[in-house]
Amino acid sequence: MSINATARSLLLTEFISAFFLTMRYFFKPKPTINYPFEKNPISPRFRGEHALRRYPNGEERCIACKLCEAVCPAQAITIEAGPRRNDGTRRTVRYDIDMVKCIYCGLCQEACPVDAIVEGPNFEFATETREELYYDKAKLLANGDRWEREIAKAIELDAPYR
């Protein structure tokens, strides 16, 4: 062992340099957030939990065109259309999304001609059972009613890119 190596090991230079490096980072502001209590802002293009929207008069937007069902690569959407109404329009009788299969690609949202199906701002929807991840029309409409303000704002902010 050389004299230089012996001096370095006796004086603990590596230990001291590592200690000062640690102290330098110890007093800097932390780059992480305290997650459950603080949340980062999400992008207007964020794709979270699905929702069905309504028109301002309360009528559901979905016209049962089944484009979202056709374009879904995971085949997670099931739609049954009701009979035509007197005014010639159709509405859905059944609108189910299997969130276990869903890959959150956003193709259903892009395919919808009336902005009925959207992916909302919620990303915290963990459940205890798989059955809770099978969303029916009532659950999707409730999600849409709950987040209508946030969804409308996100669509407005994203309008130049559509």
UniProtKB/Swiss-Prot annotation:
> How is the quaternary structure described?
NDH-1 is composed of 14 different subunits. Subunits NuoA, H, J, K, L, M, N constitute the membrane sector of the complex.
What family, per the record? Belongs to the complex I 23 kDa subunit family.
Q: What class of enzyme is it?
A: translocase
In this protein, which residues make up the domain named 4Fe-4S ferredoxin-type?
52-82, 93-122
Q: Where is it chiefly localized? A: membrane
Where does the protein end up? Answer: Cell inner membrane
So what EC number does this one have? 7.1.1.-
Q: What is this protein called?
A: NADH-quinone oxidoreductase subunit I
Lineage of this protein's species?
Bacteria, Pseudomonadati, Pseudomonadota, Alphaproteobacteria, Hyphomicrobiales
Q: What does this protein do?
A: NDH-1 shuttles electrons from NADH, via FMN and iron-sulfur (Fe-S) centers, to quinones in the respiratory chain. The immediate electron acceptor for the enzyme in this species is believed to be ubiquinone. Couples the redox reaction to proton translocation (for every two electrons transferred, four hydrogen ions are translocated across the cytoplasmic membrane), and thus conserves the redox energy in a proton gradient.
